[in-house]
């Protein structure tokens, strides 16, 4: 009995302390913070983020409380931005104040203690690695030079689909494999031997790292940190990734060159690592973190966008016919198809824009406000976590007519770009932290999609109609399809 009473006293004392701390933190906030829903003691608004994808649930909050709204996630005061004006102020006008990233348990473990580029803090390391990325690795010139790799892998994919003519195929699986091979040849200089292992590692780690952890939301609690079992699973996943990358990097050191003796991404990073003029030394973990960036952001997002575009086109046969007519007329008689040819395909590029609007590869962009700032009249305290809801902005009826409808023709009237200038459409972000692999990612979307539309007439499996296509998203950093896309390829015969 005495033991039971002691436990009750301890629990009541701990809860009382946490409630007092909660009130103390709330009292320190400025008066003019963004509005938000009524919150519960201790957990804040966590109860409002159950039973759906975060971008969907947060959209519901901003629709009710305004495009700039605060959410209390445990101990963490966070602000959601869901309008073009708010995004413009945070990513352009006040960009230095919002250029930092917050990290959580998943990103810290899987992205090598933020020594990569995606989750790096806004510091000299980030500036240096971004400069290397933009000038040495993924510049538009280098992206064009990778054209022969895209052509090789697409030729293999086309042969595979031709051999399966008239039969249902798992398009999701085959496109993921192809994009993975393209990325690995660019990054490593050759195709990865255990490609399926790498794909599974990336997909599973992205799934595990993308959710909310109680230990992240209550950072002052050593007990929750100790009991965060997903953290231990992530460390095991990290060990598997380390083992894979260490082995491959060692092979690369011995080989010393990529395909045909050319310099690949790892060669460039090793060269920079030996450069004594580097302001911040590049570590082995930094190299592995960058490679993981390339695969996690380059493979999953490009494949997901191709699949969303195909899914939408299958739901709208008239759009599919228009896209195929343009591709087949423009590419008729050409043996090599790459960026030069694809850049002339206006409607195809509108299809890609529309797929990115409805299904952005990064539905929410995380930022950290490093000093007190004012956004659309509201005060954002320093160290506030910022969530820019790109998915919600892309479906806002204030900016888009029939926002939930797939309509590539809308860009004939308002030709918005996707490189961070038009804040109605920012699938790759904007400002200093815009995705440095933007051109590489677009090339790996537009070129494969053009070839798939050129070579095949796509049909649904027997018994399915356009209304039966499952468009459900699943949890993940890239907003992928929940279920694989199964289609039937029919070889296009230009003379028939």
Curated annotation (Swiss-Prot):
An annotated GO BP: terpenoid biosynthetic process
Keywords: Heme, Iron, Membrane, Metal-binding, Monooxygenase, Oxidoreductase, Signal-anchor, Transmembrane, Transmembrane helix
Organism: Thymus vulgaris (Thyme)
Record note on what altering residue 175 to V does: In strain: cv. Tc
GO molecular function: heme binding; iron ion binding; monooxygenase activity; oxidoreductase activity, acting on paired donors, with incorporation or reduction of molecular oxygen
Entry GO CC: membrane
InterPro entries: CYP450_71D, Cyt_P450, Cyt_P450_CS, Cyt_P450_E_grp-I, Cyt_P450_sf
Pathway assigned in UniProt: Secondary metabolite biosynthesis; terpenoid biosynthesis
UniProt cross-references to CDD domains, sorted A to Z: CYP71-like
Summary of the function given for this chain in its UniProt record: Involved in the biosynthesis of phenolic monoterpenes natural products thymol and carvacrol which have a broad range of biological activities acting as antimicrobial compounds, insecticides, antioxidants and pharmaceutical agents. Catalyzes probably the C3-hydroxylation of gamma-terpinene to produce thymol.
Annotated transmembrane regions: 1-21
EC number(s) per entry: 1.14.14.-
Domain of life where this protein originates: Eukaryota
Keyword NADP: no
Applied value in biotechnology: The monoterpenic phenol thymol is widely used as a fragrance and a flavoring ingredient in food and cosmetic industries. Its derivatives have also several biological and pharmacological properties such as antimicrobial, antioxidant, anticarcinogenesis, anti-inflammatory and antispasmodic activities. Medical applications include the treatment of disorders affecting the respiratory, nervous, and cardiovascular systems. It may also act as a growth enhancer and immunomodulator. The monoterpenic phenol carvacrol is commonly used as a fragrance and a food flavoring ingredient and preservative. Its derivatives exhibit also various biological and pharmacological properties including antioxidant, antibacterial, antifungal, insecticid, nematicid, anticancer, anti-inflammatory, hepatoprotective, spasmolytic, and vasorelaxant. Phytochemical inhibitor targeting the main SARS-CoV-2 viral protease (Mpro) and ACE2 in human host cells, carvacrol is a possible candidate for treating COVID-19.
Upper classification of the organism: Eukaryota, Viridiplantae, Streptophyta, Embryophyta, Tracheophyta
SUPFAM superfamilies reported for this sequence: Cytochrome P450 (SSF48264)
Principal subcellular localisation of the protein: membrane
Membrane topology qualifier: Single-pass type II membrane protein
Family: Belongs to the cytochrome P450 family.
Binding site for heme: 435
Annotated localization: Membrane
Protein name: Cytochrome P450 71D179
Required cofactor names: heme
């Amino acid at each position: 009995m005495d033991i039971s009473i002691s436990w009750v006293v301890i629990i009541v004392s701990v809860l009382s302390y946490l409630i007092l701390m909660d009130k103390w933190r709330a009292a320190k906030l400025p008066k003019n913070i963004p509005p938000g829903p009524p919150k519960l003691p201790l957990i804040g608004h966590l109860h409002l983020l159950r039973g759906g994808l975060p971008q969907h649930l947060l959209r519901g909050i901003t629709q009710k409380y305004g495009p700039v709204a605060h959410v209390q996630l445990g101990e963490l005061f966070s602000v959601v931005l869901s309008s073009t004006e708010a995004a413009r102020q945070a990513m352009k006008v006040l960009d230095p104040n919002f250029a930092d990233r917050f990290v959580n348990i998943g990103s810290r473990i899987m992205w090598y203690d933020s020594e990569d580029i995606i989750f790096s803090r806004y510091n000299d390391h980030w500036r240096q690695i971004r400069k290397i990325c933009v000038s040495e690795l993924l510049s538009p010139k280098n992206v064009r030079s990778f054209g022969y790799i895209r052509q090789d892998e697409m030729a293999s994919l086309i042969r595979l689909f031709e051999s399966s003519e008239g039969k249902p195929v798992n398009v999701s699986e085959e496109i993921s494999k192809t994009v993975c091979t393209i990325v690995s040849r660019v990054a490593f200089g050759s195709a990865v031997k255990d490609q399926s292992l790498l794909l599974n590692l990336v997909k599973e780690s992205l799934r595990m790292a993308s959710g909310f952890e109680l230990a992240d939301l209550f950072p002052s609690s050593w007990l929750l940190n100790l009991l965060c079992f997903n953290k231990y699973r992530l460390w095991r996943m990290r060990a598997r990734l380390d083992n894979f990358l260490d082995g491959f990097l060692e092979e690369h050191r011995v080989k010393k060159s990529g395909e045909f003796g050319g310099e690949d991404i790892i060669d460039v990073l090793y060269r920079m690592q030996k450069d004594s003029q580097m302001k911040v030394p590049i570590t082995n973990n930094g190299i592995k973190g960058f490679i993981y960036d390339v695969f996690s952001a380059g493979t999953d997002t490009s494949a997901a966008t191709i699949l969303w575009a195909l899914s939408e086109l299958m739901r709208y046969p008239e759009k599919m016919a228009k896209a195929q007519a343009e591709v087949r007329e423009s590419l008729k008689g050409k043996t090599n198809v790459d960026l030069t040819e694809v850049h002339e395909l206006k409607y195809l590029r509108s299809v890609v824009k529309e797929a990115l609007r409805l299904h952005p590869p990064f539905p929410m962009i995380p930022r950290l406000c490093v000093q007190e700032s004012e956004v659309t009249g509201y005060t954002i305290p320093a160290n506030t976590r910022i969530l820019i809801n790109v998915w919600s902005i892309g479906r806002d009826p204030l900016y888009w007519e029939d926002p939930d409808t797939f309509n590539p023709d809308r860009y004939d009237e308002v030709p918005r770009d996707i490189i961070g200038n038009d804040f109605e459409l920012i699938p790759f972000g904007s400002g200093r932290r815009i995705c440095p692999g933007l051109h590489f990612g677009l090339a790996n979307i537009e070129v494969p999609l053009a070839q798939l539309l050129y070579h095949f007439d796509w049909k649904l499996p027997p018994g399915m109609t356009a209304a039966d296509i499952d468009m459900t998203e699943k949890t993940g950093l890239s907003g992928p399809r929940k279920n694989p896309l199964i289609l039937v390829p029919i070889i296009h015969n230009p003379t028939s």
